[in-house]
Design a protein with these regions (language model features):
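Non-globular targeting/processing and membrane-anchoring segments
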Residues: 1-81, 127-133, 145, 150-203
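Local sequence-structure signature of Cys/Sec-based thiol-disulfide redox active-site neighborhoods
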Residues: 76-104
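Thiol-based oxidoreductase modules, predominantly thioredoxin-like and allied folds used
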Residues: 84-88, 102, 110-125, 136, ...
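Residues forming well-ordered secondary-structure scaffolds
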Residues: 97-100, 135, 193
Length: 203
């Protein structure tokens, strides 16, 4: 057990060395799109199209997401430095909806430093933080000043997670119609559920 903890600490610290800021991530995604590519080890027309859509989505959310007064008040409880390390990819719809919100939250407290890494380039890290056995993203890993894990969040806010689970239970898998409904929910919710979830994890 002790060896596993030491190993994970090494994996986290290796990933932190490669991590980039939110603004650097936005630039990276855009530069790859200009080359006709998405992030990740696999390339396809579908992934490229998802990435193009997500870039537009994130651009809009960067301008429109508002952090609530309640969230700002709760963020004042963070007195010690934290790093929020997030696994993501440009083609991921959930990442596109949630990362702009996470970034806005982190910007409200100078003790919180947001860092991003690409999932496919950090599979050892990803495999330490699976969701129901899957490499689901985005995955936020909150670390203290010694890079010990405080808490984790992701890949979706609680309400969206329940929507996905209920649909899978009834239909077996997620189809295009459901994915459209999920995006409609995200747009209506305007990041409120993400803010509620993440502030409830703050220490």
């Amino acid at each position: 057990m002790y060896n596993k903890i030491i190993k994970m600490k090494e994996i986290i610290e290796n990933s932190l060395q490669k991590a980039i800021s939110y603004s650097e991530y936005r630039i990276l995604v855009k530069e790859l799109l200009d080359e006709g590519k998405s992030t990740g080890l696999s390339q396809s027309d579908d992934l490229l199209n998802y990435s193009l859509l997500n870039d537009k989505r994130m651009k809009r959310l960067d301008k429109t997401i508002k952090v609530s007064e309640e969230t700002i008040a709760k963020l004042k409880d963070v007195k010690e430095p934290q790093t929020w390390l997030v696994l993501t990819e440009g083609w991921c719809g959930d990442a596109a909806q949630n990362l702009p919100v996470i970034n806005k939250i982190a910007e409200e407290n100078s003790n919180i430093k947001l860092k991003l890494v690409l999932r496919d380039e950090n599979l050892e890290l990803m495999d330490g933080f699976l969701t129901n056995g899957g490499r689901s993203i985005p995955k936020l890993i909150a670390l203290d000043k010694d890079n010990k894990v405080i808490n984790t969040w992701g890949p979706r806010p609680v309400v969206a997670t329940k929507m996905v689970a209920d649909y899978k239970a009834e239909h077996g898998s997620l189809d295009a119609e459901f994915k459209k409904d999920l995006q409609v929910w995200y747009n209506k919710n305007k990041g409120e559920n993400v803010q509620e979830n993440i502030t409830s994890l703050l220490k």
